[in-house]
């Protein structure tokens, strides 16, 4: 799983991670079996909203959900899951970019500097093990906090 920070400002009112899933295996992977989790602190009590700003797979094929989490530099995760219409990733292929944007309902600032999955130095796609990829409920990439 590759990650890049589309917004490197750690102290503004939006979190903008982008993702690219690479299939290093020898057979196609059905995207509907995969989920991506990005871990962060929501820095306050306001609820968090999420949007897919753009995705090569088509934003309508990606669902966004949020969950509570207790771990190092995280109290919340955002999970991206894929519909069957998203298709599959061929052996040796990749999903293409998915651009996620999150903000709080009151538009207050985040402090991403203390977020487990944030790395503002990653401005181009790079492998990043602090964003976790699940397949059929099992971790296949990354380390959860």
From Swiss-Prot:
Originating organism: Paenibacillus lautus (Bacillus lautus)
UniProt domain CBM3: residue ranges: 1-145
Cross-referenced InterPro entries: CBM2/CBM3_carb-bd_dom_sf (IPR008965), CBM3 (IPR001956), CBM3_sf (IPR036966)
Molecular function terms from GO: cellulose binding
Biological process per Gene Ontology, one example term: carbohydrate metabolic process
Superkingdom of origin organism: Bacteria
Pfam families according to UniProt: CBM_3
Protein name listed in UniProt: Uncharacterized protein in celA 5'region
